[in-house]
Amino acid sequence: MPDMTSASSGTVLAFDFGKRRIGVAIGEHELRMAHPLTTIDQSMTRPRFEKIAELIEAWQPVLLVVGLSVHADGTEHEITRLCRRFARRLEGRFRIPVALADERYTTVIARSVLEEVGVTGKKQRPMLDQIAAQHILQTYFDLSHAAS
């Protein structure tokens, strides 16, 4: 997997991986701004990767960023392993570099953002994961810019 400064221009897609849903965000490396894109609400592998293939075809990203789920203290758990596997599959299937980014608290932040604009309860579900992906990507941009 590339380091955080491997791409300097072009479209970037980010993923908030979950067993049931995958949030997707998009941004331009040069602008360093992330935006929520969509949520893939599917637990089966084949339909998930078909949707991702459609997004990659449409947006032609130069880099993919996958949120790496870890405990608050940084230790890994079952979902961490699944996130790493998902990242390897993306890189292998689409031949696009993949970076891993810390995703701690992104769902909490996304929930808070939605509550601030009056979206609560079950109404959050369709947007929550893509906003979490947006925060993953924005953090990636912020950290990669700070490192350069």
UniProtKB/Swiss-Prot annotation:
Tell me which InterPro entries the record gives: RNaseH-like_sf (IPR012337), YqgF (IPR005227), YqgF/RNaseH-like_dom (IPR006641), YqgF/RNaseH-like_dom_sf (IPR037027)
Which keywords does this Swiss-Prot/TrEMBL entry list? Cytoplasm, Hydrolase, Nuclease, Ribosome biogenesis
Any one Gene Ontology MF annotation carried by this entry is: nuclease activity
Could you give one GO CC term from the UniProt record? cytosol
Q: SUPFAM superfamilies, from UniProt?
A: Ribonuclease H-like (SSF53098)
Q: By its UniProt entry, which Gene3D superfamilies does this protein fall under? A: YqgF/RNase H-like domain (3.30.420.140)
Q: Which domain of life is it from?
A: Bacteria
Taken from the record, one Pfam family name reads RuvX
Enzyme Commission number: 3.1.-.-
What HAMAP family does its record include?
A: Nuclease_YqgF (MF_00651)
Q: What does this protein do?
A: Could be a nuclease involved in processing of the 5'-end of pre-16S rRNA.
Q: Which NCBIfam families match?
A: RNAse_H_YqgF (TIGR00250)
* Family the entry assigns: Belongs to the YqgF nuclease family.
Q: Please state what the protein is called.
A: Putative pre-16S rRNA nuclease
Q: What is the lineage of its organism?
A: Bacteria, Pseudomonadati, Pseudomonadota, Betaproteobacteria, Nitrosomonadales
